[in-house]
Amino acid sequence: MIRILFMGALLMALFSACAGAGRVVSTAGTQPPVITRSYAADKGGYGQTWKIYIEAEDPDGDMVKITSELQQEGVRYQKPVDTIFVKKRDQKYLKGYLALDTFFLREPSFSVSSRLALRVSITDRAGNESKTAVFNFEYTGRTSESTSLPAPFDQGDIPKLGNIVIEGKYPPPRSD
């Protein structure tokens, strides 16, 4: 009898713990992140690292990912979108740069455009998305001279937020 009562009490405790486990208090806010400032060079040489500078804030402090989508005429990318997760310390405010190594992209040719377009947005824990920032880049055949960065990216060390990794599938060679 004592065994039955003990087992019953144990089962009740387990069921009540499981019933409460499904309730999770969401800390996600209702306001989307805002990209307050952004900058990227618009010209450069093939093979150089393209740095995309962004400053963003989220009133709710729950930014979780930065999404980048690359477009280049004449190239069909296997994975045109890349996601970089925001570090916990940067979820309310972030300032830094994304790095895209153009060496791994398709070199411009007769069938591939020398112009790239990169679309960047930030999403928070609730799925709210910032407005998209669009950056255009054109291969010039040589690396660009280093130019001074605009504020606030010219102040001290700017941290790298992550590397944008894009995988390309190139058009087949012409048979003519």
Give names to the regions the model predicted.
Residues 19-34:
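Proline/serine/threonine-rich low-complexity linkers at boundaries of modular beta-sandwich domains
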Residues 15-17:
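C-terminal motif of bacterial Sec signal peptides marking the signal peptidase cleavage site
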Residues 37-44:
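Short beta-strand segments of immunoglobulin-like
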Residues 55-61, 124:
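Extracellular acidic, Ser/Thr/Pro-rich low-complexity tracts
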Residues 87-105:
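Aromatic sugar-binding surface patches on proteins
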Residues 128-174:
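Short beta-strand elements
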Residues 46-52:
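Structural beta-strand segments of beta-rich domains
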Residues 104-115:
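Short glycine/proline/serine/threonine-rich loop/turn segments at secondary-structure transition edges
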